[in-house]
């Protein structure tokens, strides 16, 4: 399936400032971009909150070449991970504008201990020309030797930040649907946001699925709860 067909890829932000995150979290990543240098990072948080998106956005902004290895599939095979990392780390990039390449290990908590130990070694072996960004849902599944070699950023959202983030995504979602020429009902969008928050990836995927019927209206929901639209729009 084409990435351009998938809305989560088509509308994935490629700048940190466009990522929907708590201000304090976004400022941390913006600081790395402004320095033009990334540390080794361990990004921890629930599914769909934007960990991989922010990793790619930082690489795009600083002009770093990067690869993504998914820990849930190929990332479970020691030789595959070791060979891909070594091949990427030792190859000269003619297009990168950054001083380091970046290896993104997505869902690193689904890799085996042997793979994580190998990655720990790679972090040290290739520190002169590579940085590593690990994403995980469960930080306790990351071995301590790998954990200790990374700057940890927690994507946990505080209750007082929820309303602002839901409002930002409400605006983002309306923009996507308008560009895709999909009719929608504001109240239904608000209901969907409340239902899937904070899994933005799931929300966009569900909206694309519903949009296949021609419109996102109350007809797609068995029950539409009352939601204060003014709160989302404020």
Predicted segments, located by residue:
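P-loop/Walker A NTP-binding region and its immediately flanking N-terminal helices
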Residues: 1-169, 187, 191, 205-208, ...
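A short, charged helix-loop
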Residues: 168-180
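A short helix-loop-helix "switch/interaction" segment in the helical subdomain of ASCE P-loop NTPases
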Residues: 178, 187-201, 221, 233
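AAA+ ATPase "lid" subdomain C-terminal helix
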Residues: 182, 194-219
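Loop-to-helix "switch" segment enriched in basic
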Residues: 213-234
């Amino acid at each position: 399936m084409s990435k351009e067909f998938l809305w989560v890829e088509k509308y994935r932000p490629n700048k940190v400032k466009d990522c929907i995150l708590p201000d304090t979290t976004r400022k941390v990543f913006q600081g790395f971009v402004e320095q033009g240098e990334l540390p080794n990072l361990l990004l921890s948080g629930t599914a769909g909150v934007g960990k991989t998106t922010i990793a790619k956005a930082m690489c795009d902004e600083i002009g770093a070449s990067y690869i993504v290895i998914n820990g849930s599939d190929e990332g479970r095979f020691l030789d595959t991970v070791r060979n891909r990392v070594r091949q990427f780390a030792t190859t000269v990039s003619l297009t990168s504008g950054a001083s380091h390449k970046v290896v993104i290990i997505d869902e690193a908590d689904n890799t085996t201990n042997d793979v994580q130990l190998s990655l720990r070694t790679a972090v040290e072996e290739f520190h002169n020309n590579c940085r590593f960004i690990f994403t995980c849902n469960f930080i306790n599944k990351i071995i301590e030797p790998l954990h200790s070699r990374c700057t940890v950023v927690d994507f946990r959202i505080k209750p007082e930040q929820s309303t602002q983030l839901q409002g930002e995504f409400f605006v983002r979602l309306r923009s996507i649907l308008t560009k895709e020429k999909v009719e929608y009902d504001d109240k239904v969008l608000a209901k969907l946001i409340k239902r899937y928050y904070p899994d933005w990836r799931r929300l966009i995927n569900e909206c694309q699925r519903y949009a296949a019927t021609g419109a996102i209206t109350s007809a797609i929901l068995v029950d539409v709860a009352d939601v204060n639209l003014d709160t989302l729009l404020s």
